[in-house]
């Protein structure tokens, strides 16, 4: 192969733009073919418009099919990804739970530096070019054909778009059908009566069904109660782990063991019942007893989950059930909610059919796949964008060789 390596990147999203810059930096002649009128539009929607770039701690266990991409994740760590963006001039800040954002708190800043990176590395960006076919050329290379009749030739092709799975299927790759993940969950709403709009921090355990004794996954974070069920980042994470019939158990007192909870509520009962008897000549009711524990509406929901009414007078015999409800508030999952707003889709080409470091196809040498093209999805908190950047860096550098 004489002269510069010709690389065509199919898709001008997060992973595609990074792949293009890295390939161009390595000396390749790079063209990006984007079907939309502008590149990087999905980047602008990430992180509620703030763009959660990556996470300070990324492990293969954070991903579906993480074992298939372990070498890549080790090579292209958060430090290396942030180094790439630092070279493009982006400033960042780290927030709670390791989430890393641009210092500007604006996703358009990230897209701006990626566009600039393409410009300064002479990447030829062509929008309105929907690729419909990739054909092998003889003796080597590929012909990339667009819906509008345009065609391009390349020594290497990087498929960096979710729509590229059809292209990979035509090349013989195994495709897992797409389905939404990282979205709210519909649940049985009876236990959630009166909680719509309330936020509460909890340790959430997911069980595959009502009979399971060991959780499939455990997460801690803020839960948002909705009229259809549960939302919030911790619930988005759980949507990757559970299906219909699963049970979510919310522990509103994760910092206390069951024994410590028993002690807390017993001491509170002794103190409050003595005061109520002396002042009012009666026992406190459960609304009075739960005051100060959680949000008022969460207090009432816990009492009802324990099998009581908030207006009932509290007795010592009630306390174990109150503790059990506070540390094991249960809601059965009935499905996914707001799937049209899902942050990520699960599915794509099997990553096991690609090199675990370079992402070159094991079936079609010279073809690479990145980002959402592959059946890899991660937790909330910057993990999915990290995969986009890291996979783009890996494929771009490898394709230029």
Give residue ranges: language-model regions.
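Short hydrophobic core segments
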Residues: 8-10, 33, 131, 144, ...
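A conserved short coil-to-beta-strand element within the FAD-binding core of flavoproteins
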Residues: 127-141
């Amino acid at each position: 192969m004489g002269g510069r390596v010709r690389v065509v990147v199919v898709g001008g999203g997060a992973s595609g733009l990074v792949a293009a810059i890295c390939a161009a930096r390595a000396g390749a002649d790079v063209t990006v073919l984007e079907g939309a009128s502008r590149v990087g539009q999905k980047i602008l929607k990430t992180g509620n418009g703030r763009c959660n770039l990556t996470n300070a701690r990324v492990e293969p266990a954070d991903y579906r099919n993480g074992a298939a991409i372990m070498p890549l994740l080790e090579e292209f760590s958060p430090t290396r990804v942030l180094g790439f963006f630092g070279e493009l001039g982006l400033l960042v800040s780290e927030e709670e739970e390791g989430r890393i954002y641009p210092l500007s708190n604006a996703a358009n800043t990230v897209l701006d530096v990626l566009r600039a990176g393409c410009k300064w590395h002479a990447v030829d960006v062509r929008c309105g070019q929907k690729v419909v076919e990739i054909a092998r050329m003889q003796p080597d290379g590929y012909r990339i054909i667009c819906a509008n009749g345009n065609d391009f030739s390349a020594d290497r092709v990087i498929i960096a778009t979710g729509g590229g799975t059809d292209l990979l299927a035509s090349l013989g790759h195994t495709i897992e059908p797409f389905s939404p993940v990282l979205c709210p969950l519909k649940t049985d709403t009876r236990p959630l009566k009166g909680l719509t709009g309330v936020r509460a921090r909890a340790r959430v355990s997911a069980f595959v069904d009502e009979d399971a004794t060991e959780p499939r996954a455990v997460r801690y974070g803020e839960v948002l109660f909705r009229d259809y069920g549960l939302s919030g980042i911790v619930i988005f994470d759980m949507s990757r782990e559970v299906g219909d019939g699963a049970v979510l158990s919310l522990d509103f007192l994760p910092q206390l063991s069951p024994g410590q909870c028993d002690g807390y509520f017993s001491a509170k009962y002794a103190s409050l019942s003595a005061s109520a008897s002396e002042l009012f000549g009666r026992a406190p009711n459960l609304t009075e007893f739960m005051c100060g524990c959680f949000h008022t509406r969460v207090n009432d929901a816990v009492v009802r989950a324990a099998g009581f009414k908030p207006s009932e007078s509290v007795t010592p015999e009630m306390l174990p059930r109150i503790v059990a409800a506070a540390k094991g508030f249960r809601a059965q999952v009935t499905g996914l909610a707001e799937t049209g707003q899902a942050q990520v889709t699960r599915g794509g080409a099997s990553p096991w059919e690609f090199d675990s470091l370079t992402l070159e196809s094991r079936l079609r040498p010279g073809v690479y796949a990145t980002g959402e093209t592959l059946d890899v999805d991660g937790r909330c908190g910057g993990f999915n964008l990290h995969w986009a950047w890291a996979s783009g860096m890996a494929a771009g550098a490898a394709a230029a060789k």
